[in-house]
Amino acid sequence: MPGLLSDILAWVVIGTFVAGAVANGRDRELGRRVMTAAWVLFALFWLQLIPHFTLVHKSYIEGLLTIAAVPASLYAGWLLYNGRDTLFVLSRAVAAMGVVYLPFETIPAFTLLGATVPAPRGVLMETVAAQTRFLIESLGYTPQMIVGDQGYLNTFLWMQGSHRLEISVVLACTGLGSIAIFAGLIAAVDAPMGRKLRGLAIAVPIIYALNLLRTTFIAISVGKQYFHLFVDEVLFLFGSSDPYMVSFFISDRIISQALAVVALVGVTYLVVHEVPELLTVIEDVLYMVTGDEYDLRNELGLD
């Protein structure tokens, strides 16, 4: 995230969703009003992230999704306020996603009773970086592992002649975001705990393993400059002047992000066979996009 104010806003948004979920259990109409307010705040949250993803992060896919999230959040709040009660499930899911993700994003290292407790993000990033290093070295490559800009041992140093190429495993490279999405969705639906746990047992290992393949692919592709192709066109497309970034843009921003969408669809297909209640959320999203009602349980033969 861009900074402290963004982190604070994120906690306010998630806190409002959690408050709405609690209120909904006691007074449905109060819960509806609180969750509607949460969706408006969620739209503001995505709005302030647009410059980060489009101008700083230079990700077309994430940038477009962030832009789309603003009206989508407002529309979800409007539908919920006007009686589409199935959106209570999606609202609870957003609350649970935030509870899973934000501690890693925002909690710093601290000292407790004389013992230093490391930042959760640092532990996760260093763990993923170490496992990525194992895969890279298993393929015969030997980049040096160094401490990155954030102070964690999460960065690979490659040399192209006399030019240093540093590729860091940041929080967005850990798979946590996708894991939080599925954890939130599964936690939010009304289903037996056994099936929920089976759904998590499917989603989490697959996402984590695929993410390790992704970080390995990107680190090698950038370190060895395997996608140094269409240099002028790619630099123009992403607004950059560094030719060494071309392999990164192609391997990460184009190939990996496109494959990530396909992977998420595949994981969703597997999970809904264990937790078909998730289809309620998918049906709501499809309704928001198309304006048509769907019965996915019947279409997928999951009744």
From Swiss-Prot:
GO biological process terms on file: proteolysis
Cellular component annotations (GO), alphabetically ordered: plasma membrane
GO molecular function, one term: peptidase activity
Predominant cellular place of this UniProt entry's protein: membrane
Keyword Transmembrane helix: yes
Annotated active site: C173, R214
Bilayer topology term: Multi-pass membrane protein
Residues the record marks as site: Transition state stabilizer: R253
Keywords annotated in UniProt: Cell membrane, Hydrolase, Membrane, Protease, Transmembrane, Transmembrane helix
Record's subcellular location: Cell membrane
Enzyme Commission code(s) on record: 3.4.22.-
Residues passing through the membrane, by range: 3-23, 36-56, 60-80, 93-113, 169-189, 200-220, 259-279
InterPro entries named in the record: ArtA, Exo/Archaeosortase_dom
Effect of disrupting the coding gene: Deletion of the gene results in poor growth, especially under low-salt conditions, alterations in cell shape and in the S-layer, impaired motility and impaired conjugation.
Class of the enzyme per the UniProt entry, highest EC level: hydrolase
Family, per entry: Belongs to the exosortase/archaeosortase family. Archaeosortase A subfamily.
Function: Transpeptidase that recognizes and modifies its substrate by proteolytic cleavage of a sorting signal. Following cleavage, a covalent intermediate is formed via a thioester bond between the archaeosortase and its substrate, which is then transferred and covalently attached to the cell membrane. This sortase recognizes a tripartite structure consisting of a conserved Pro-Gly-Phe (PGF) motif, followed by a transmembrane alpha helix domain and a cluster of basic residues, usually at the C-terminus of target proteins.
NCBIfam families (alphabetical): exo_archaeo, exosort_PGF_TRM
UniProt name for this protein: Archaeosortase A
